[in-house]
């Protein structure tokens, strides 16, 4: 419980349960955080949020979403859960307008993007079947890492911080 509470305190984090058809409980519970990229799509416009900067992109949402998915295909190392790296987010009902021409007669009360996708660097995966927890620190091909030793120690520090947070009792 402490892990869940401490995990959800910051923005751009999520919990995902991998429920399969006919099952009550999923095999994996995935906690994601620390996205290096966030894509937002709204009113047929595309945006990339990276390093706290929001940049308008030229590509239309449908094409860009297809490209994101295509570029994200890679092999998961053996011994890790098949969901050890992912793109997470949501597609609103309004996103159907990227595929079909239907009128937009609804008022935008929520003022949230039609689609929001994030690529988390950090995943904590609980394998409910094997009763194991995996800490995944993703390093993506398009990241420009100059010092891998420094990156290793950053990941190690983050893991130790997480252990400390999850073992601290909160009343």
Residue ranges and their predicted role:
Residues 62-80:
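FAD-binding glycine-rich core of flavoenzymes that anchor FAD
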Residues 74-77, 81-110:
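Extended, Lys/Arg-enriched charged tracts that mediate electrostatic binding to polyanionic substrates
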Residues 1-13, 18-55, 98-171:
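Extended accessory regions or peripheral subdomains of proteins
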Residues 55-62:
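Extended, highly charged
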